Amino acid sequence: MAERSLAGGKLQVRELRGDAVTIGPEHVEAQESTVTAIDIALEPDETMIGKAKAANATLLQNFPKGFSLDATHHPHVSIFAGFVPTADLPKVYAEADKILAKENYTAWKLTALKYYYIPLGPIGLGGIVVKPTPDLLRLQRELIDAVGPFTVKTATAAAFYTTPTEPDIHPSVIDYIAAFMPDHSGKNFSPHVTIGVGTTAFLDAMLAEPFTDFTFSPASASVYQFGDFGAARNRLKVFAPKR
């Protein structure tokens, strides 16, 4: 079990040992703000989606106020996260497209290793840890080099996707995205697929549950506008996979 503090942009993680994306419009607008919280992500195939949705259903039984993996909470593996001036989004899309177009990522075989969660008071944000690979690390480094120059240091909750019924953004989410490049890339990169929210007591109980490794592949890549809990809420741009 590994723990790191979430305060000040540091991610506190407790490992849990244990046991198709529908593509929408190619390009939609971010919610109106001068800065947008973006997530450049690989979207998994049906193998991972099925596992993530099954775990999500279990968490919702424990904590019904959590979120469902649905049309505005997409299962994904974040490769890059940052705050970008909204006016620069077309440039970001163009730079990301150049990099992703070179990658045959749908042929990659990724391994899901275990559950983890991030404690957030009495609840926790759970996910499935994915083994880092040279391909993932190379892709991340190239995206950081290309898109990083467009980023700003921080933002407010206005940079995120919200709804009238979900208006809030945890400050820790803002801190995490602000610190993503220095603190969560390279040797510190921990790729994962978020599965939802549960009580920490329930997530702790999962420590005794076996987790069987499985493999999956990315099916597509997109840029999202982040919502609360680091969810991929608003798909801004879809990239066609290499054929």
Indicate residue ranges for each PLM-predicted region:
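N-terminal amphipathic/basic-hydrophobic helices that include classical n-h-c signal peptides
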Residues: 1-29
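Basic, often amphipathic N-terminal segments
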Residues: 23-120, 133-222, 226-228, 232-243
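Short histidine-centered catalytic/ligand-binding loop motif
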Residues: 127-132
